[in-house]
Amino acid sequence: MAVKIRLKRMGAKKSPFYRIVVADSRSPRDGRFIEQVGHYNPVAKPEAEVRINEELALKWLADGAKPSDTVRNLFSKAGIMEKFHNAKNAK
């Protein structure tokens, strides 16, 4: 089972927010997911709001889940990708 960490679109028309979820790569974008890792609100003022459960994100990355490009960028800004690579190279 190929597992991805990706964004699930929520919210009203023209006012989206996203949940960062772990899902099977074959399931639809807004369909079934395994676990919610955080959320991302690009419309929030004064700047975009991002909340990520770092512990869960690192656990899923260690288990082999592949992040989408956007999620990888969000994780990089939060410092999660750096922690993951440091832990991976320390072994």
UniProtKB/Swiss-Prot annotation:
It comes from the Bacteria. Pfam families: Ribosomal_S16. Keywords: Ribonucleoprotein, Ribosomal protein. The keyword Ribosomal protein applies. GO terms for cellular component: cytoplasm; small ribosomal subunit. The keyword Hydrolase does not apply. GO terms for molecular function: structural constituent of ribosome. GO terms for biological process: translation. Belongs to the bacterial ribosomal protein bS16 family. HAMAP family: Ribosomal_bS16. This is Small ribosomal subunit protein bS16. It comes from Exiguobacterium sp. (strain ATCC BAA-1283 / AT1b). The gene is rpsP.
